[in-house]
């Protein structure tokens, strides 16, 4: 193979680039454009975390931009519109289709409705002009409904200084109404406002878990204009199942059964659970209280006795399969240090007791009828067959393939972004705050390097789905449950104890020291520095652990260097947190933390226009307004400018 010098490579690269910029005027125009963009204010970043399948609450937070939409409406119209008019306009922007139906039903004549159309279109155009004031025209155009771009741009940039175009603008709007396009235009304008108030979305983990509609969240994210994802422990569990880990698959099926969410598997992703049910009905009883499904807070109709019976049996069957599948992984990976989790081998089947961590406990609600006490890891032939069928169904689900591929494409274990570190779980440390080490494939890693190696193996496992018991696939499961995992953040997962031991002391899961050390500003500064970030300016933005505001816990920790934004989208946590989640806004002026009250139904917002969700707290204000130049995107643009200037000097100025 012919060696190519750096000089030759540079020439070939510039030759290719010059094909796009074949005149100095074209090149100069692009440089001028990019240099100018660097001077614009940075766009608004929106941080959300721990969605846990709660689609209704999540989509509402997206629609209102964590209160940003109402703030913009107030900025412009507070002195000009009544409270009711402000509320109606807010509800219209949030839920345009639904609000339009309600408003139109109030009018007695077409004339009255047409006057409302004209006024509303004017208000929405004014709102878009305000929301887009820090964007280029090109970027704004991409946010507008394609079919109405020409009309909207004419109204946005109208100049009527000499009255020459007054009737032109009036005719534009009147024709929209006359040709029955007003509803669609208003709907398009409302969604444009939603898009413009947030430039970029960060999802700091756990799209999946016990909530009923993670698939709808994934569809929404796939269609979102700009975002990134930091994987959560539940997200990696689903990725692992799709990538070929049967133990990850058993875990997520068990969680779905426990929280009465098996319809995610069957209805949302089209996976047939009939073979699992057949197995469960053959071996398990319906009256085991430890395995009855939890009542779903969002589900109004109760399960029938038959449905509850089937789920209880499935729950036992898949839990036993999970405990069996864990054994060979723990044995072939001694570096995982999980010998205490060989739970089925630690059971005394004669006395119905177990000894774990030096303590012996009596067992309750047991269902060991498929366990071979001489070889507890052994699957029954029908258990093996069921898992093979389920794994094949998972990997052949087109919708699941689309969702998992998107998670891999947009996701990572952590992300340095605009000077901040975004991470779902933790950075594993010891009691002294030193990065904990973990051995993988004969090498020892810690801190950022450990997270990079974990991520490498997640991607390798995903790319090699046919391998189901290789190191990479085992490490995906370890991320779910291992003590040095940055996603789990605890010393052991006590699933077995929670089902079968009455003594709640055995259920306790000890957290990594990170979770109390993150209160220390010096510790957070050290972590930021270890990840190559400016400790004076940067922050860690964290999810994973619900903030118990009801007990006085503060999501702003370490003098504002650590922000924890899991306040409980999940309805199951809201009684312990006291709220329904935190989100974070970061615009060119600084950061605001937003606490959300429980989202009950959009009907109240539609009828009253009152959005009680958003209570803002200023985290800080920038001393100097941040520009695009100061962001990740700015660095990328500057790199492009440097190359274009190199081309200019090479081809046109020398």
UniProtKB/Swiss-Prot annotation:
Residues 298-307 have a biased composition (Basic and acidic residues). Pathway: Carbohydrate biosynthesis; gluconeogenesis. Residues 288-307 are annotated as: Disordered. Its cofactor is Mn(2+). Keywords: Carbohydrate metabolism, Hydrolase, Manganese. It is an enzyme of class 3 (hydrolase). Transmembrane segments: none annotated. Pfam families: FBPase_2. Coiled coil: none annotated. InterPro entries: FBPtase_class3, Metallo-depent_PP-like. Its EC number is 3.1.3.11. GO terms for biological process: gluconeogenesis. The keyword Hydrolase applies. GO terms for molecular function: fructose 1,6-bisphosphate 1-phosphatase activity. It comes from the Bacteria. Gene3D superfamilies: 3.60.21.10. The gene is fbp. Belongs to the FBPase class 3 family. This is Fructose-1,6-bisphosphatase class 3. It catalyses: beta-D-fructose 1,6-bisphosphate + H2O = beta-D-fructose 6-phosphate + phosphate.
């Amino acid at each position: 193979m012919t060696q190519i010098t750096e000089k030759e490579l540079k020439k070939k690269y510039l030759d290719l680039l010059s094909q796009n910029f074949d005149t100095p005027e074209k090149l100069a125009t692009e440089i001028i454009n990019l240099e100018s963009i660097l001077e614009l204010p940075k766009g608004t970043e929106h941080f959300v975390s721990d969605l846990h399948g709660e689609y209704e609450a999540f989509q509402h937070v997206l629609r209102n931009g964590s209160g940003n939409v109402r703030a913009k409406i107030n900025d412009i119209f507070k002195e000009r519109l009544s409270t009711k008019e402000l509320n109606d306009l807010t509800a219209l922007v949030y839920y345009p289709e639904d609000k339009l139906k309600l408003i139109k039903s109030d009018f007695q004549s077409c004339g009255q409705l047409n006057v409302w159309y004209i006024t509303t279109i004017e208000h929405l155009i004014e709102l878009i002009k305000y929301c887009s004031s820090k964007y280029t025209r090109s970027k704004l155009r991409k946010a507008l409904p394609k079919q109405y771009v020409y009309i909207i741009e004419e109204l946005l940039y109208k100049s009527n200084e000499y009255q020459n175009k007054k009737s032109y603008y009036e005719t534009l709007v009147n024709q929209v109404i006359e040709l029955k396009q007003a509803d669609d235009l208003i709907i398009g304008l409302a969604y444009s406002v939603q898009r413009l108030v947030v430039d970029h979305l960060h999802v700091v983990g756990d799209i999946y878990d016990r909530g009923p509609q993670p698939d709808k969240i994934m569809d929404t994210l796939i269609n979102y204009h700009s975002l990134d994802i930091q994987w959560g422990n539940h997200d990696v569990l689903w990725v692992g199942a799709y990538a070929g880990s049967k133990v990850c698959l058993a875990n997520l099926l068990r969680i779905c059964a426990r929280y009465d969410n098996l319809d995610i598997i069957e209805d949302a992703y089209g996976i047939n659970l009939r073979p699992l049910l057949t197995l469960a009905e053959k071996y398990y009883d319906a009256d085991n209280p430890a395995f009855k499904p939890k009542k779903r807070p969002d589900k109004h109709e109760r399960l029938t006795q038959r449905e509850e019976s089937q789920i209880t049996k499935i729950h036992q069957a898949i839990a036993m399969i999970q405990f069996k599948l864990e054994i060979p992984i723990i044995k072939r990976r001694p570096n995982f240090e999980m010998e205490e989790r060989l739970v089925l081998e630690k059971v005394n089947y004669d006395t119905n007791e177990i000894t774990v961590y030096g303590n012996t406990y009596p067992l309750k609600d047991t269902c060991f009828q498929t366990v071979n006490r001489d070889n507890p890891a052994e699957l029954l032939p029908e258990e093996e067959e069921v898992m093979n069928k389920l794994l094949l169904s998972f990997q052949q689900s087109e919708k699941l393939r689309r969702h998992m591929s998107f998670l891999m494409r947009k996701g990572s274990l952590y992300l340095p972004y605009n000077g901040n570190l975004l991470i779902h779980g933790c950075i594993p440390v010891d009691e002294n705050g030193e990065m904990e080490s973990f051995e993988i494939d004969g090498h020892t890693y810690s801190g950022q390097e450990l997270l990079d190696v974990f991520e490498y193996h997640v991607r390798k496992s995903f790319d090699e789905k046919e391998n189901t018991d290789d190191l990479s696939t085992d490490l995906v499961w370890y991320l779910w449950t291992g003590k040095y995992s940055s996603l789990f953040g605890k010393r052991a997962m006590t699933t077995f104890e929670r089902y079968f031991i009455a003594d709640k002391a055995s259920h306790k899961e000890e957290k990594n020291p990170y979770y109390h050390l993150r209160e220390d500003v010096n510790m957070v500064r050290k972590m930021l520095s270890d990840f190559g970030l400016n400790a004076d300016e940067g922050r860690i933005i964290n999810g994973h652990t619900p903030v118990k505001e009801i007990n006085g816990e503060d999501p702003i920790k370490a003098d504002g260097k650590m922000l924890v934004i899991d306040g409980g989208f999940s309805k199951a946590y809201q009684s312990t947190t006291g709220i329904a989640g935190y989100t974070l806004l970061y615009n060119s002026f600084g950061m605001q933390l937003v606490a959300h009250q429980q989202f009950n139904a959009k009907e109240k917002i539609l009828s009253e226009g009152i959005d009680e969700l958003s209570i803002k707290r200023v985290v800080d204000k920038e001393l100097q307004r941040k520009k695009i130049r100061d962001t990740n995107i700015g660095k990328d643009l500057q790199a492009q400018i440097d190359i274009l200037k190199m081309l200019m000097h090479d081809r046109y100025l020398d």
